[in-house]
Each structure stands twice: as C-alpha cells, then as structure tokens.
Amino acid sequence: MSETSTTTHISQVGTVMVPVSDQDLALDFYVGKLGLEKTADTPFGRGDRWVEVTPRGAQTSLALILPQEGEEVGISTRVAFASDDVDADHAALSERGVDVDEEVMRMGDPIPPMFFFRDQDGNRLLIVQRG
C-alpha cells in the first residue's frame, strides 16, 4: 500500500468572501469607515460585480459579494483584523458611527485585547491587538 501525500501548494489565505446586500453601501463602509483600499470593482458573470477591499499592505482581501440563493447577510464572519492599537481603532470606529462593542475585551495573557463590530448589513467582524 502506498502512502498518500497530504502536501498541497496552498501558501496563504487570498480572499475571504463576505456577503453584503448592497455592494455600493458596503464599499462606503469598508473604504469610508474602516479605511480599507478598494482593490477591485469589475463586472463579473451576468450582471454581477466582483468587488474587493484590502487592508493597506495586506495580501488577504475581502470580496464583498451579493448572497447566492439560500445565503444570508448579517452573519458572524469569523474575520479578524489585526491592529497595532485596538483602543485607538475602537474609539475611531465608534466616532465614525460604526456599531462596535461597548468596550474592548481584555481577558489577560495570552489572549490579546479585541472587540467585535458590525458592518452595514450586521456582519460581525473582529479587531485583535497584534502581538
């Protein structure tokens, strides 16, 4: 019996898809409030658009996609952004009218400070203090 290799050529997470009800409103939120860069906005398929936003300097992007049949918006995405200063980001997003948790969670070492926030569709995302 021969061994089966479990090796792949996967090297990173490239794109995470986040379902949104309106791509223009999503761009206003992710670019205008979060400060991400719009890195793609092009026709896709039959009348659809492929819209991507990316944190500055990051290799992983978010695709802001319209939900397919049976999919919903307003989900817990499990997307976590890294930040060098979660307290400053919490304050800034709150000032911009973003739906953020009341305060930054602090559970003690080794768990870093973090907070959840919601986009214009209620999709739940997280910002975590980097190392």
Q: Where do the protein language model's features map onto the residues?
A:
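Eukaryotic phosphotyrosine signaling hubs
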Residues: 13-15, 74-79
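Residues at or immediately preceding the N-termini of alpha-helices
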Residues: 23, 86-87, 120
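Short amphipathic alpha-helices within nucleic acid-binding modules
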Residues: 29, 87-92
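Short hydrophobic/aromatic beta-strand micro-patches
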Residues: 17-19, 54, 80-84, 128
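Vicinal oxygen chelate
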Residues: 2-9, 15-18, 39-42, 49, ...
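Core segments of cupin and vicinal oxygen chelate
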Residues: 10-11, 17-59
